[in-house]
Amino acid sequence: AGVVIGGAIPDCIALAERLDSPVCSGYQHNDSFPGSHPMAAGPLGYNGSKAGMELIAKADVVLALGTRLNPFSPLPGYGIDYWPKDAKIIQVDINADRIGLTKKVSVGICGDAKQVAQQLLAQLSSTAGDTDREARKATVHQTKSAWAQELSSLDHEDDDPGTVWNAEARERESHLMSPRQAWRAIQ
């Protein structure tokens, strides 16, 4: 929430573009980074982006900018225990009591997300992010594309084995559109 509340979205975009680094948003904070941006990997946590989870699992450094790392964002999803075990975690939060509260961090920074992002940008070397830049961009694109294809394949309205709630809802309210029908309609 710190990125949104602090007006740091443009600074977050600038960091992502400077480093060509994928950006995941926290649980229920999809507004913290534009989903249309090429480096947007999507939200983490319950019903989040499988692409984001796969990408963050490969991270060697995670900058948790303006987030308390709530307990829901790093929960496993889609059978992926994605929170990186060996990555250096840098957590930036305006509330010092939240730093390291739910996840072990390598570096904790108590500060405003916007100011910290601007200071980080100013301190980056001219070659920061150059190593494997093109490969990283390709990996982000391929991972997001695979997730988009998987989502578009979810074109059935069948219930999971042993459940009937979809069938009952369709019968009861046939005039309403299911989420999967809505997804297909906007494709």
PLM regions: where:
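Phosphate/diphosphate-binding loops
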Residues: 45-98
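Short, solvent-exposed amphipathic alpha-helical segments in soluble enzyme
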Residues: 9-20, 77-82, 107-108, 125
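Short, acidic Gly/Pro/Ser/Thr-rich loop/turn segments
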Residues: 4-6, 31, 70-71, 97-99, ...
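Phosphate/pyrophosphate-binding active-site segments
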Residues: 86-187
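Cofactor-binding loop segments of dinucleotide-utilizing enzymes, especially the Rossmann-like FAD-
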Residues: 1, 26-28, 67, 92-94, ...
